[in-house]
């Protein structure tokens, strides 16, 4: 009922494997189909953003009548470009000048709620430690047993220690304006920065992260905890998890790293980040993928999206199809990037309390920023990651402020996984089948109306809520051009001289059967068929089939044709089918005489040559061949060749693999792909999920209710596979990305089989 409707930019369908239930099947009505529902509500556009795949694009396209589809994915994204930044802040200081190496111990990991209990620091100059600083810090609370066990610091040791503000001021006075270095500096600098903000203390020191240096310079180490790196570098033993010892170890660690950097031609801190770019892509340091929304702005963007999806499945698959930031940057033309949900890079940084400049650096890469209803992120409250709903609202306020400062639109999205609130139970069952312990936690990520979304974000103020819910989402929709997910028309590959070879085969066979001057009915039929076939560029399809059939026959395996290809005389003359589609007639195998008149005589009409009586050739006395099945060519190609040829061939099971290999030989390894298939949850499987779900929870339900729940879970993607016989061939002047993505069947990176998506 809102006068201007929003646009949903973050929506999952049944092709988000075992995770979402939103349907886009053209057969479903608005009560089930989200595209038709959005259109019925008056929405101008809707995005499709499944997890790492584009498998709902065709159905969404067919479902859309008067609504624009925005084609995209929610990618599993890894930042391999600037996530491991060694130096933060501006500095041109040479390696041999003074650096303050420090470490802190805290009451916990969350810089918003926890506090510092010890600060230790050393001054490193020209490879030597020249000064030290150490202080306990009063936490104003009792330490937990876990922190006492981990750090060895007790409550008694903190009696009389300076306050948080006093300790911070003392440490910063010791550090001055010198660069600070720490192992996992993001943690240590984050606590220092948070304390400085709280007490109004200026803090602008540049920082160096020895953890990131280790990950980049020691790519094969695998694990990079301070003690592991120290042991690898043969540094002195130390009391780990005490600030003073950890700080000294960082001090001892930097000189060998600086020596490695000098061997690379570097001389000062400001050169480090640039030199690390090519190193970030390698190494064994684990990176957890985050989420990213990628929308296609135009046809170029769609092609790049298909390419990124394909590379994620083929080259960078690690449990998920990964999109690397470096690869996205190389293929960014025509793409629109959104910051995604709570699993996105930006929201994580906001929740982690990263400083404002770092948030701006992260957000600047995106084209638009996302915020979502706080109900989407209530799990953070249940898990103790935040302490109140208001804190979740503050996260969204921070993103809005970032958008305002950077001039980027902020969009409210739903992260839709099912259509209506009552559908949530089906997702609980699916998640339970995968073993998720929190499968039953409420998460109302259904397709919300514009009014519902405006109410969700009313705490931002009426005008801002309208901007993020309506104005900005429509703006993103306007950025996207109308796109067809698959280009129209036939894109036939090339076989050298295919039209000439087809003509030679056909006329050669015609002369073999009907003599040097075939009857006019034969000539006319061949001319009509060849004219349509060559004009519509179907000659490649015919010759492909002919070569496959001939190859099989040469190896001793018969091929059976079926279907309407039997209505094509050219197919018969070229050896694709054994069915002669001419009217019933006699032909002499010896002198080539033929008789088309006998079967047309009203006194004894025959529709099929095989039914005619036996007769001998009146010219040479040889028994006639009875031929012709009287099938019009239009049955196969339509009138004027308006139907693409569908040549169905049955190859021997023993020889089928050879036929596949021969197809690769004909068209090239890079232009032939196995046809992919999608396996979905069948009703019997869904019924098993329902029974197990109810049993594990000690619940009972009527048979009708069990059936209802099972039906609600059917049709959701489980896996992918390959068609036993289907092959997809693309033209030599095209790439598969011009048509669709590709992948390994069943997401198996160990197979060399590549299928269409």
Model-assigned labels for residue ranges:
Residues 734-743:
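Glycine-rich active-site loop/lid that clamps phosphate-bearing ligands
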């Amino acid at each position: 009922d809102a006068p201007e409707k929003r646009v949903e930019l973050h929506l999952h369908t049944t092709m988000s494997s075992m995770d979402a239930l939103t349907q886009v099947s053209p057969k479903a009505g608005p009560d089930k189909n989200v595209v038709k529902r959005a259109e019925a509500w008056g929405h101008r556009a809707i995005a499709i953003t499944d997890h790492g795949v584009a498998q709902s694009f065709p159905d969404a396209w067919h479902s859309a009548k008067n609504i624009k589809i925005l084609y995209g994915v929610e990618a599993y994204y890894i930042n391999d470009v600037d996530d491991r930044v060694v130096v933060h802040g501006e500095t041109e200081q040479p390696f041999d000048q003074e650096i303050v190496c420090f470490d802190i111990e805290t009451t916990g990991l969350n810089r918003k709620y926890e506090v510092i209990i010890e600060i230790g620091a050393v001054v490193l100059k020209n490879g030597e430690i020249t000064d030290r600083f150490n202080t306990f810090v009063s936490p104003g609370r009792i330490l937990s047993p876990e922190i006492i066990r981990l750090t060895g610091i007790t409550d008694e040791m903190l009696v009389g220690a300076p306050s948080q503000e006093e300790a911070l001021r003392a440490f910063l006075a010791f550090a001055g304006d010198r660069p600070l270095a720490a192992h996992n500096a993001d943690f240590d600098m984050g606590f220092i920065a948070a304390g400085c903000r709280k007490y109004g203390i200026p803090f602008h020191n540049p920082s160096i992260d020895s953890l990131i240096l280790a990950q980049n310079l020691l790519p094969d180490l695998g694990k990079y905890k301070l003690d592991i790196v120290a042991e690898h570098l043969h540094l002195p033993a130390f009391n780990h998890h005490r600030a003073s010892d950890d700080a000294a170890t960082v001090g001892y660690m930097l000189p060998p790293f600086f020596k490695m950097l000098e061997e690379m031609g570097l001389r000062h801190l400001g050169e480090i980040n640039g030199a690390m770019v090519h190193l970030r892509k390698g190494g064994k340091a684990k990176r957890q993928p985050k989420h990213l929304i990628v929308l296609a702005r135009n046809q170029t963007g769609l092609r790049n999206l298909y390419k990124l999806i394909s590379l994620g499945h083929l080259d960078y698959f690690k449990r998920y199809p990964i999109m690397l930031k470096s690869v996205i940057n190389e293929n960014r033309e025509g793409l629109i990037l959104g910051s995604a949900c709570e699993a996105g890079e930006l929201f994580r940084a906001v929740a982690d309390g990263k400083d404002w400049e770092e948030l701006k650096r992260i957000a600047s890469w995106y084209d638009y920023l996302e915020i979502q209803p706080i109900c989407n992120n209530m799990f953070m409250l249940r898990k103790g990651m935040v302490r109140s709903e208001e804190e979740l609202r503050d996260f969204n306020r921070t993103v809005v402020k970032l958008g305002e400062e950077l001039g980027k639109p902020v969009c409210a999205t739903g992260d839709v996984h099912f259509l209506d609130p009552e559908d949530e139970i089906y997702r609980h069952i699916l998640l339970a089948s995968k073993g998720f312990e929190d499968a039953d936690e409420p998460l109302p990520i259904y397709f919300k109306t514009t009014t519902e979304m405006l109410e969700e974000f009313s705490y931002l103020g009426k005008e801002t809520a309208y901007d993020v819910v309506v104005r900005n989402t429509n703006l993103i929709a306007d950025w996207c051009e109308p796109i067809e997910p698959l280009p129209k028309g036939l894109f036939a590959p090339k076989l050298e001289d295919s039209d000439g070879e087809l003509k030679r085969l056909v006329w050669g066979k015609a002369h073999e059967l009907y003599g040097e001057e075939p009857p006019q009915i034969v000539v006319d039929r061949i001319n009509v068929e060849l004219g349509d076939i060559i004009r519509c560029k179907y000659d490649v399809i015919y010759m492909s089939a002919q070569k496959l059939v001939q190859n099989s026959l040469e190896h001793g395996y018969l091929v059976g044709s079926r279907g309407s290809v039997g209505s094509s005389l050219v197919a018969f003359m070229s050896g694709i089918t054994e069915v002669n589609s001419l009217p019933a007639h006699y032909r002499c195998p010896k002198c080539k005489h033929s008789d088309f008149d006998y079967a047309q005589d009203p006194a004894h009409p025959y529709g099929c040559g095989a039914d005619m009586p036996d007769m001998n050739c009146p010219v040479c006395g040889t028994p006639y061949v009875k031929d012709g099945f009287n099938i019009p060519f239009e049955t196969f190609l339509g009138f004027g060749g308006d139907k693409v040829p569908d040549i169905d061939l049955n190859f021997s099971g023993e020889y089928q693999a050879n036929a596949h290999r021969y197809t690769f030989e004909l068209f090239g390894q890079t232009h032939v792909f196995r046809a992919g298939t999608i396996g979905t949850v069948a009703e019997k499987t869904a019924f098993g999920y329902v029974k197990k779900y109810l049993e594990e929870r000690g619940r009972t339900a009527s048979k009708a209710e069990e059936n209802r729940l099972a039906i609600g879970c059917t049709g959701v993607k489980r896996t992918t596979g390959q068609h036993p016989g289907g092959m997809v061939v693309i033209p030599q002047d095209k790439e598969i990305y011009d048509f669709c993505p590709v992948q390994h069947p069943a997401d198996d990176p160990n197979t060399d089989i590549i299928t269409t998506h």
